[in-house]
Structure formats: C-alpha cells, structure tokens
C-alpha cells in the first residue's frame, strides 16, 4: 500500500508531475516484483494522492462514518509512515486523527469490535482448526487467526494513548513506557 500527501499550495504543474511520478513509481515497483495492491491502494490512483486538506477531509470521513470499510481503511491509514519528503504532513494528519478521536470514540469502539471477528483457530479441546475447503484447504490463515487481532489491538491502544509512531513492536514498547501495558 502507498499514498502521497502533498502541501495544499502545490501548483497545477507540480500536481501533473506528482501524477506522472506516481505512475512511474508503481510501474517500477511492479517491474522488480512487488505486486500491485489488489485493493488499489496505490499512489497512482487519485484517491490515494491528495493534498493535506484533502487527506484531512477523507480521514474525517473514515473516522466519523464507521462502516466496516471505513474502519478497515482508517485503521490501515494509521500505519502511515513517511518514506520521503516532509514528515510534518504526516504528523499533521496524525494530530488531526488524535484530536478527532479524543472527542469522538466511535472509531476506536468499532475497531475493537472488528477484532472480535477474528477468533483464534482453535476447536474442541484446543485443537488447531484449518481451512476446510478452497485453495487454502488444510492451512491456517495466520493473519486472520492471530496477527490481525494483535496488531490492531496494539494499534487501538496506541491511538488512545497518542503513541502511534513505528511498528507494532515500537508501539508496544511505547505503551509499556507509558504504563498502558506491563
């Protein structure tokens, strides 16, 4: 997944260059074996290439209308990390999200509810359950069976504590330092 955030003052010519760059970037990633995102979450798509104010509006929409898709997309967006350019734009979006969620807990509540949709793959007497049919027959979906609940649980706690930077491990350490986790 990738996106572009640009300053609100970017000119039309600069926007055209950003669009061309984003097309070239995705083509280059594909050429070295990085598969395109099946959900289309790529900077070459205009909805994933916005100004700071455009991203603020979209983020507010995700946080306020807590449909399953908005919660999934908003949660994923909280993992945003700058790879190049002005990190203050990412910081501004995080600050916007924190301020919004400090006053409106609906998104965090829905995020926590979503975690209950992914139960551990245990059956009777603690036996491991595997997929019964389809292309993954006999296998466990590790992402859905455990990793998702851990990463999103830590993410929800990190959002509430205002310590969202870094990986899941970094967030866990920050939560321990803040006394949220022991």
Regions found by a protein language model. Name each.
Residues 6, 40, 154-157:
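Active-site proximal loops enriched in glycine and acidic residues that flank catalytic Cys/His/Asp
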Residues 8-16, 178-181:
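Short, glycine- and charge-enriched coil/turn segments that flank and shape catalytic ligand pockets
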Residues 4-12, 133-138:
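Glycine- and acidic
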Residues 1-6, 22-25:
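Extended, hydrophobic alpha-helical segments in both membrane/secreted and soluble proteins
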Residues 80-81:
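Small-residue (G/S/T/A) turn/hinge positions that recur once per unit in extracellular repeat modules
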Residues 85-182:
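Conserved nucleotidyltransferase catalytic core and NTase-mimicking acidic/glycine-rich helix/loop elements
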Residues 11-75, 84, 88-96:
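Conserved catalytic core of two-metal-ion nucleotidyltransferases
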């Amino acid at each position: 997944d990738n996106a572009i955030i640009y300053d609100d003052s970017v000119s039309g010519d600069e926007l055209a260059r950003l669009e061309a760059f984003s097309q070239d970037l995705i083509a280059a990633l594909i050429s070295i074996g990085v598969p395109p995102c099946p959900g289309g979450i790529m900077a070459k798509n205009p909805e994933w290439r916005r100004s700071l104010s455009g991203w603020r509006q979209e983020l507010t929409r995700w946080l306020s209308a807590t449909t399953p898709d908005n919660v999934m997309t908003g949660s994923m967006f909280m993992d945003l990390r700058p790879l190049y350019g002005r990190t203050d734009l990412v910081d501004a979006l995080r600050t916007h999200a924190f301020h919004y969620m400090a006053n409106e807990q609906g998104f965090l509540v829905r995020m926590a509810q979503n975690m209950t949709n992914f139960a551990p793959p245990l059956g009777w007497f603690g036996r491991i359950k595997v997929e019964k049919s389809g292309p993954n027959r006999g296998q466990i979906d590790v992402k859905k069976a455990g990793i998702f609940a851990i990463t999103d649980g830590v993410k929800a706690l990190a959002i509430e504590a205002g310590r969202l930077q870094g990986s899941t491990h970094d967030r866990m350490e920050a939560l321990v330092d803040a006394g949220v986790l022991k």
